[in-house]
Design a protein with these regions (language model features):
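Basic nucleic-acid-binding interfaces
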Residues: 1-150
Length: 150
């Protein structure tokens, strides 16, 4: 086959360093738009994004031309730099060192979109750690708690 095809949808989740509740409503929409631009520049279009005070969920179509870890690195690095430029509130802002990256089957994309859109509702009832543990279990991905929470 002379053509290269890829249909890889990724659900990316990561928190603020130490799960500090730093993401303010005032910057959230602009942050989401900025991250969408980073993904677009890496040929990985955004499908859905939402965040709460201490973490973010990003659903996107992973490019076949860019390594997944590199795309995540760019999103985390440049969004952190951008936040620090927005307000003194973010002077010592950092994302956690790690992240969760889960593949999403085409049949599940809409369900994951709905899940991401409803983050504020979810987190009225459970915290990020509980949510992330559940998501790892659901995706058959063992979680080593010694290294999961920085």
């Amino acid at each position: 086959m002379s053509q290269s095809l890829a249909n890889i949808v990724v659900h990316l989740v990561f928190s603020t360093k130490g799960r500090r509740p730093l993401l303010r409503d005032e910057e959230r929409g602009q942050l989401h738009a900025y991250i969408a631009g980073i993904l677009k520049n890496h040929d990985s279009p955004l499908i859905e994004i939402n965040s709460v005070r201490d973490h973010i969920h990003i659903l996107f179509a992973q490019s076949k031309n860019h390594a997944p870890a590199k795309v995540v690195e760019q999103v985390k690095t440049w969004s952190s730099v951008w936040l620090k430029q927005q307000h003194a509130w973010y002077a010592d802002f950092a994302w956690q060192g790690g992240y969760g990256e889960f593949s999403v089957s085409p049949r599940q994309v809409e369900a994951v979109r709905r899940y991401i859109r409803r983050q504020q509702e979810h987190h009225a009832q459970k915290n990020f750690q509980t949510e992330f543990r559940h998501y790892c279990e659901k995706n058959a991905k063992p979680l080593d708690e010694r290294y999961a929470w920085d």
